[in-house]
């Protein structure tokens, strides 16, 4: 039987995909076996009427080894 643990992260990037990749990369520094990331919300940062970046809140799921 596998045990899955979930942590919540907030990550930023120039695109949503970039933000998520940054979040996975940072989470992978402290946890192994990341299997899934679930997005809770996305915020766009706006400056001078243009979107200049994204902030994403996501849950990162990973398998705990015995």
Q: Where are each of the predicted segments found?
A:
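Short N-terminal signal/transit or membrane-insertion segments
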Residues: 1-2, 60
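Short, well-ordered alpha-helical segments
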Residues: 2-36
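A cross-kingdom feature marking charged/low-complexity
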Residues: 38, 43-66
């Amino acid at each position: 039987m596998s045990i899955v643990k979930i942590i919540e992260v907030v990550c930023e990037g120039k695109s949503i995909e970039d933000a998520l990749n940054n979040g996975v990369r940072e989470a992978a520094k402290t946890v192994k076996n990341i299997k899934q990331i679930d997005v809770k919300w996305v915020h766009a940062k706006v400056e001078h009427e243009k979107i200049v970046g994204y902030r994403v809140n996501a849950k990162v799921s990973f398998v705990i080894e015995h």
